[in-house]
């Protein structure tokens, strides 16, 4: 379970760093992605609770394009690190 917490934390940090590294995006995108850190406890495997209102508010504040671009960056990480693609369906 500790490794899953570490993975979830790492993913959230990557989200933040990916948003911060995009100079073409406004600081609003970076700040909004950073606010998603409040969703950290909800994204851990085994969590059956509902996300906090703070998490939901942060998610509502993120621009759709900003969120999609950040997710695309994260999904490309295995390739950039010479790792096999992640297949969540299997």
Swiss-Prot record:
Entry GO CC: extracellular region
InterPro entries noted in UniProt: Bifun_inhib/LTP/seed_sf, Bifunc_inhib/LTP/seed_store
Disulfide bonds: 29-66, 39-55, 56-81, 68-88
Keywords, sorted A to Z: Disulfide bond, Secreted, Signal
SMART domains with a match to the protein in the record: AAI
One Pfam assignment: Tryp_alpha_amyl
Top-rank taxon, per record: Eukaryota
Main location: secreted
Subcellular localization, as worded in the UniProt entry: Secreted
Signal peptide: 1-26
UniProt record similarity statement: Belongs to the A9/FIL1 family.
Protein name per Swiss-Prot or TrEMBL: Protein LIM2
